[in-house]
Structure formats: structure tokens, C-alpha cells
């Protein structure tokens, strides 16, 4: 296998470019937010084709969603009124938490063996007590392995006595020809939907025993978010397909507890693997939020998934 890792500065951002030259797969990661800004493959004519929305474009659009694959944590989506109480300590923050706004440290890059990877890190020195009051670090690794791009979160609770509570996930948006053109194939199994009018949980849920196939929701619901718990999904592979452009992404969400589907009506779909849920209209203390993840003192917590970009026929 032949891999390469290069660095470049573009539009004020420090970028890492990791390429699998044999299989024709390339990712670009910005150290600002450790955000994937590009996932590309070489097509049959030798051209690099991007799979993310606005793939590789660092400009700010005049309107609409401006990101590519936001890293979310130490909470997901929103806090009610931008604040929460964690063991009585006030936490404040904007959408999706503070990880997206930090400059991450590249602590390891590997281009040897059968896969290549980039490992980024945030430590307690990188955030304030108002952002998160406990000493918890996170490593985020992106790996190219054969045709897939793997994502691995690894949290470590450095507190000797306190249990840590947090939520995290990734917010990748996959580009389409238009909002009308894409399809999402969902696997069979038991789902639980959480309703979130106004972006916060209402307390209403609904179970769905799905036979598998085309997403059983109207696209008109996507701007309000479709939040699903993967209760019992034997083969949790989700397929995003845009027939007009021939782009197809298979997401393997084995071990992922929740997924959020969202679009603002633009030519993309976000399929967000989540370890946790958004806040509730009737807000609970941070440590008692629904879906919160728990890390005992001195222990670790990890979560992973993979994305496989492919080219589909237009049949």
C-alpha cells in the first residue's frame, strides 16, 4: 500500500491531506475543529470527486449550512438557552459544543502498513471550566483502510474521583445534485424516534419496526431533524445515494446508539452518528440528560464508525 501525508495552509486554515494513492482515496482535515473538509475518490476517468457537501470549499456561503463534517462535543446539538448546570456548575456554549471551535493538536500520523491515519487531540488545557468543568481529554483518529474512512473517538477521564458525563458525535453532510435527488436506504430493525420541536426534546417518542429500504420519513421533516435510537438493528449500514452524480456512501454504524438525519433543504443530507441526545425543553441537570455517556474515574470511553465512498450506476 502507498500512502502520503502532506500539510498545506489555505484560506487561513492548517490542513492535513492523507492520500491512499493505490486505491484512490483522499481525505483533508482542518486542524480548526479537526473537521473533515473533504472525502474524495478517483473515478474511472482519473478525476478526484468529492463526496462531502461543498467538498474542499473553505469559503463562507452567503446562506445555508457552512460546514462539512462538524465534530460535536462535549454535548450534542444545543443546550437550552445556551447553558446547563453540571453538578451545579454552569456550562455555556453554542451549537454542538466547543470542540468545533478549537485548534486541535496533531499528535500522530501514520502512512505505514495496510492503513494510514491522522490522530488529533484536545486536552483539559485547551478548554475552560465554563466550557466543561472536568479534566477529560479526547483523541480523534481518521483512518483510511482499503476503501473506507474510519472515525474513532477516544475519551479519557483524568479525574481521580469524579465520574464524567458527556455526549459526542460527527455531523457529516454528503453532497447531492439537489435536495430532491438523493436517497437514503436504511437497514431493517427496531428504531425509536425522539421528537424535538424547536430543536429540543419534547418527551414524545415513537417506536418503528422497519423492514428496510428507502427512508420512511418525508424529506420535509429533515430541517427539523429526525433523531433515531438504533434499538435493535442487526446490520446497521445506511446508504446515501445520489443517482444523478453517481455518488454513494455506505455508513457502518455498528455500536452507534443514535443517528440524526438533517438538511436545511440544500443539496445535501447529514447523517450524524451520535453518542447522546440534544437537550430537552424541560431541561435536566447535565449529568442526568437523556443519552448521556458515562466515564468512571480514570477510565476511557471510545466510539467509532466508518464511511465508504463509492460510485454507483445511474440505473
Predicted regions and their residues:
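Acidic/His-leaning functional-site neighborhoods
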Residues: 91, 96-109, 211-290
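Extended, loop-rich substrate-binding clefts of extracytoplasmic carbohydrate-active enzymes
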Residues: 1-10, 87-146
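Acidic, contiguous internal or C-terminal segments within carbohydrate-active enzymes
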Residues: 18, 30, 122-166, 170-172
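Beta-strand-rich interaction surfaces with strong enrichment in secreted/lumenal proteins
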Residues: 139-141, 290-295
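Active-site/ligand-binding surface loops and adjacent short beta/alpha elements
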Residues: 2, 161-165, 173-253
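Beta-strand-rich N-terminal accessory domains
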Residues: 1-69, 73-83, 90-93, 234-257, ...
Amino acid at each position: 500500500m502507498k500512502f502520503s501525508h502532506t500539510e498545506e495552509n489555505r484560506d487561513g486554515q492548517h490542513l492535513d491531506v492523507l492520500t491512499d494513492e493505490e486505491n484512490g482515496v483522499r481525505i483533508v482535515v482542518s486542524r480548526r475543529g479537526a473537521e473533515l473538509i473533504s472525502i474524495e475518490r478517483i473515478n474511472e476517468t482519473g478525476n478526484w470527486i468529492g463526496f462531502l457537501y461543498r467538498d474542499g470549499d473553505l469559503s463562507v456561503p452567503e446562506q445555508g449550512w457552512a460546514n462539512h463534517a462538524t465534530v460535536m462535543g462535549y454535548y450534542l446539538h444545543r443546550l437550552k438557552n445556551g447553558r446547563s448546570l453540571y453538578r451545579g456548575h454552569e456550562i455555556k456554549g453554542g451549537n454542538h459544543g466547543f470542540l468545533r471551535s478549537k485548534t486541535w493538536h496533531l499528535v500522530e500520523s501514520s502512512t505505514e502498513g495496510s492503513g494510514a491515519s491522522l490522530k488529533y487531540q484536545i486536552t483539559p488545557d485547551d478548554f475552560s471550566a465554563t466550557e466543561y468543568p472536568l479534566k477529560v481529554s479526547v483523541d480523534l483518529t481518521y483512518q483510511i483502510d482499503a476503501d473506507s474512512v474510519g472515525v474513532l473517538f477516544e475519551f479519557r477521564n483524568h479525574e481521580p474521583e469524579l465520574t464524567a458525563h458527556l455526549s459526542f458525535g460527527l455531523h457529516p453532510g454528503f453532497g447531492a445534485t439537489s435536495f430532491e435527488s438523493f436517497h437514503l436506504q436504511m437497514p431493517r430493525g427496531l428504531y425509536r424516534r425522539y421528537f424535538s420541536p424547536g430543536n429540543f426534546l419534547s418527551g414524545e417518542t415513537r417506536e418503528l419496526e422497519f423492514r428496510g429500504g428507502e427512508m420512511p420519513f418525508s424529506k420535509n421533516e429533515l430541517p427539523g431533524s429526525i433523531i433515531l435510537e438504533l434499538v435493535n438493528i442487526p446490520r446497521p449500514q445506511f446508504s446515501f445515494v445520489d443517482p444523478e452524480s453517481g455518488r454513494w456512501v455506505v455508513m457502518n454504524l455498528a455500536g452507534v446508539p443514535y443517528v440524526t438525519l438533517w438538511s436545511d433543504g440544500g443539496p445535501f443530507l447529514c447523517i450524524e452518528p451520535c453518542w447522546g441526545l440534544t437537550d430537552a425543553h424541560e431541561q435536566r441537570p447535565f449529568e442526568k440528560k437523556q443519552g448521556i455517556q458515562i466515564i468512571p474515574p480514570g477510565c476511557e470511553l471510545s466510539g467509532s464508525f466508518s464511511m465508504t465512498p463509492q460510485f454507483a450506476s445511474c440505473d
